[in-house]
C-alpha cells in the first residue's frame, strides 16, 4: 500500500493562487480608486497622483489625498 487514498486518480493539490482568484477586493471598485491612471501634464501617472513641484506637474506615489 502506498498510503495514498486516491491511488490511480488525479490528486489535486491546494491551489496556491486561490486567494488571488477569489479576492473580494476585485468585486469592490472603491478599493482601487487610489490606483487609477491620471493625466499629469500629458504624462500618464498610473500609481498615485499629480502634484505641482517646482512649477511642473509631476507624478507622486505618496502624499496623495
Curated annotation (Swiss-Prot):
Residues 1-36 form a propeptide. Disulfide bonds join 40-50, 45-59, 49-64. Keywords: Disulfide bond, Ion channel impairing toxin, Knottin, Secreted, Toxin. GO terms for molecular function: ion channel regulator activity; toxin activity. Is not hydroxylated. Residues 14-26 have a biased composition (Acidic residues). Residues 1-33 are annotated as: Disordered. It is found in: Secreted. One of its GO terms (cellular component) is extracellular region. Expressed by the venom duct. Its main location: secreted. Probable toxin that inhibits ion channels. The cysteine framework is VI/VII (C-C-CC-C-C). The presence of a 'disulfide through disulfide knot' structurally defines this protein as a knottin. This is Conotoxin Am6.4. It comes from Conus amadis.
